[in-house]
């Protein structure tokens, strides 16, 4: 019996003000857990898989049922502990403590290998939580669309005089994270050709408006890119195929995209990357019968994929790793210069991290889109001079379809997050919003992750692999009063390559919530400024001084 498969269930978060838990502080994690498994949100909800290969919301269906039952009974001075998707304890704490503490996929470093994780996973002792799957704050592809948009815009500034009009981007992967790429590209003014091996993913991105159309052949896709370059009208096109075949073919043809990247689930060579020449049926069967053969074949294919990216890079085409660890996988198979092209964080995003700017997000527990539109307006009111942010919010309202509970992603930093959170809480208190909102973020943030091949790649002081920082971030968020806090391993880049922390706080309109929000939404981004100031980044040092952070190791 497969305890992780239930084709008879359809999970959707409740809407409205009626709650089945004892307070909004426990109703909120209940709804967000359920929202992660909404069919409009999750990739394979019947298997509890939310996104990112096998990133799950709960370890198995029995654990899911026990978590939901525990949340409904939880008192406002109790804390539920989750160990890799399984509820293991309820303890008396206090009203300002987190209601839920989550640890996912954490393994003692010497044993933190994919093989050992898979053994534990098969035994039912662990699950892969990715970043926001197991921490219950995934909001669909919107969750990464602004970060991807900001990256593409910055590429345009650096390489193309500030405009991507008439340019096109080559990428692969249209899963939960990669599915944001086509919309991010067209919002940034560029066209995109996205290669995807699974028809269902292309269909989902078409259905949700993230992808404009599908091409039947590579020739058709290239013709569309050529026409869009002439007209300077941005369009996104999905092509069913394998990137390990399509990317090298484009190199052979002498085709020159304007930007090259990739968001396949290469971090998981068994469950996330289809080997070249294999059918989906072959892949699925072999994953169960001979996972090592799948891993070898996948990594061999990644070598061809990355070599093509290196070839584009050698031609002077901006080429970037978008954080799926594909360079590492190729290097492991003998491609020595796999890291010749950069990751997106050191190349384009780190200056934002130095100021604590990152993927702030919130979701309306009412289920009413109007609550999000009202909060959009409040963000504009409180940040009247940030025209770039206003433009983002306008485009998001016009072009992003909500998946599950209505939500918004909005990159803001230290000094702004707590102001927005307090304003949202006041809107709930005054009845301007129909129900409370939850405020969280991706684990991909300035102070909450150690990932030497992604967020902390090429740190100025060489501290790429120091993972004290996400541990401190999680501990501080617990002490500050976040509603739930998570500490994960392996998200984004795979087992053995990252540690990271998440937090969510509920704005329920109470004065007590306001105090917690003020602490959490100041302290959380401040750890990012602290981390980068400690590494010697002048932007972060200046920000720390400007914001009055007390950093004892920072010279006065």
Swiss-Prot record:
Family: Belongs to the urocanase family.
One of the record's GO molecular function terms: urocanate hydratase activity
Classification via InterPro entries: Urocanase, Urocanase-like, Urocanase_C, Urocanase_central_sf, Urocanase_CS, Urocanase_N, Urocanase_Rossmann-like, Urocanase_sf
Name listed for the protein in its UniProt record: Urocanate hydratase
Catalytic residues (UniProt): 410
Cofactors demanded by this protein: NAD(+)
Subcellular location: Cytoplasm
UniProt main location, coarse: cytoplasm
Annotated EC: 4.2.1.49
Gene that this sequence comes from: hutU
Cofactor note: Binds 1 NAD(+) per subunit.
Gene3D superfamilies: Urocanase like domains (3.40.50.10730), Urocanase superfamily (3.40.1770.10)
Superkingdom as given in the UniProt entry: Bacteria
Species name: Bradyrhizobium diazoefficiens (strain JCM 10833 / BCRC 13528 / IAM 13628 / NBRC 14792 / USDA 110)
